[in-house]
Amino acid sequence: MLRDLDILKRINEKTKAVVQMTLTTADESLCRIIEPHVCSTKERFEALKTLRDNGIPTVVWLCPILPYINDTRENIASILRMCIEAQVRGVICFGMGMTLRDGSREYFYRQLDRHFPGLKERYIKEYGDRYEIPSPRDDELMSLFHHTCEQSGIMHDNDEIFAYLHRFEEKEPFGQLSLWQLPRNE
């Protein structure tokens, strides 16, 4: 997206241009496993800071959070520190966990066997065929999430963030003159 920075800046001069991206883990090696075909966490963090420096607002999606893999206090706190430093406007989080559709589940389980031997059996035992796969640490991590965002002035209510994203903001660099401000021919 940074290759389009000039376009984003021009759009942002006229109206709000918000860039959104996911952050799943602060651990680079884990990032390559969880999201093998995307930019590294470090590259995304640098992009967030570049966007900030150019006045482009950003929103982070905190997902997926995989039970027993990246659902740690250290990981969530590290991601939130990045968000604070990058001055993101909001962080969208629907809870600590993930969803698994049929079809995706089989692929996911193969990847668990490949990268985290033995974890597939735990998932099957605890979650069965459920679509929603919540972290057993959801309450603790969501409390950390909300508290940290609140203390840092980062939007963390999903409805508030979506309202912000959908609110049209026209930017008029000079404003509109009222009838009484028009120059007179005297």
Specify the residue positions occupied by each region the protein language model found:
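Conserved AdoMet/S-adenosylmethionine-binding subsite of the radical SAM
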Residues: 1-126, 130-133
